[in-house]
């Protein structure tokens, strides 16, 4: 059975970019050894509503790239520009810590292989919390969370704890949480890593549909080459650089 993911034409303007990374470099220091360069001059641009997949061997730098794009880590060199506004110039962040945290909460959603749902809170509460933290208003947050979860086929599971949900349901809750603040960009790191093939397929088709409907940009790290090939663009990470899949 093949994935049925409709490609779409992202963005509304030829020159408009949601995210632009220019010559990003990241190295890590190792005791008694020269610094290990993980990313070596990464260039990446992502348009509004575009879905980009990144494949590559374990340890090739894919997760490091997502951490930089999500402002969870700092580049050594290069620039990161989000929706036309510079965020990093080299290792210098142009926002204060408070501004950066607020920016990340408003503009970027994250989905991980391990969903990181809070075990003592229901599906509804886990999703609502993403908005509640920023607004302090619980009732409207729960109302919006309920609508979003219903759209993702979880209407009957709102009051269930994560332990009472299947793996596929848990990841759908994680996606709802990532979308709660209407981010312009969602970064996903091996979101189907713990799912069977059926749930993986459903998850990827869901993300492709959301990307199209909401004009939300997605950058997804995956080992699923079948899905990767259905995205608007597939990139391969090797030796700290990106190139087109098959290139």
Curated annotation (Swiss-Prot):
<comment type="function">
    <text>Part of the ABC transporter complex LolCDE involved in the translocation of mature outer membrane-directed lipoproteins, from the inner membrane to the periplasmic chaperone, LolA. Responsible for the formation of the LolA-lipoprotein complex in an ATP-dependent manner.</text>
</comment>
<keyword id="KW-1278">Translocase</keyword>
<keyword id="KW-0472">Membrane</keyword>
<dbReference type="InterPro" id="IPR017871">
    <property type="entry name" value="ABC_transporter-like_CS"/>
</dbReference>
<comment type="subunit">
    <text>The complex is composed of two ATP-binding proteins (LolD) and two transmembrane proteins (LolC and LolE).</text>
</comment>
<dbReference type="GO" id="GO:0016887">
    <property type="term" value="F:ATP hydrolysis activity"/>
</dbReference>
<dbReference type="InterPro" id="IPR017911">
    <property type="entry name" value="MacB-like_ATP-bd"/>
</dbReference>
<keyword id="KW-0997">Cell inner membrane</keyword>
<dbReference type="InterPro" id="IPR027417">
    <property type="entry name" value="P-loop_NTPase"/>
</dbReference>
<comment type="similarity">
    <text>Belongs to the ABC transporter superfamily. Lipoprotein translocase (TC 3.A.1.125) family.</text>
</comment>
<dbReference type="GO" id="GO:0022857">
    <property type="term" value="F:transmembrane transporter activity"/>
</dbReference>
<dbReference type="InterPro" id="IPR015854">
    <property type="entry name" value="ABC_transpr_LolD-like"/>
</dbReference>
<keyword id="KW-1003">Cell membrane</keyword>
<dbReference type="GO" id="GO:0005524">
    <property type="term" value="F:ATP binding"/>
</dbReference>
<keyword id="KW-0813">Transport</keyword>
<keyword id="KW-0547">Nucleotide-binding</keyword>
<feature type="domain" description="ABC transporter">
    <location>
        <begin position="19"/>
        <end position="247"/>
    </location>
</feature>
<dbReference type="InterPro" id="IPR003593">
    <property type="entry name" value="AAA+_ATPase"/>
</dbReference>
<keyword id="KW-0067">ATP-binding</keyword>
<dbReference type="InterPro" id="IPR003439">
    <property type="entry name" value="ABC_transporter-like_ATP-bd"/>
</dbReference>
<protein>
    <recommendedName>
        <fullName>Lipoprotein-releasing system ATP-binding protein LolD 2</fullName>
        <ecNumber>7.6.2.-</ecNumber>
    </recommendedName>
</protein>
<dbReference type="GO" id="GO:0005886">
    <property type="term" value="C:plasma membrane"/>
</dbReference>
<feature type="binding site">
    <location>
        <begin position="56"/>
        <end position="63"/>
    </location>
    <ligand>
        <name>ATP</name>
    </ligand>
</feature>
<dbReference type="Pfam" id="PF00005">
    <property type="entry name" value="ABC_tran"/>
</dbReference>
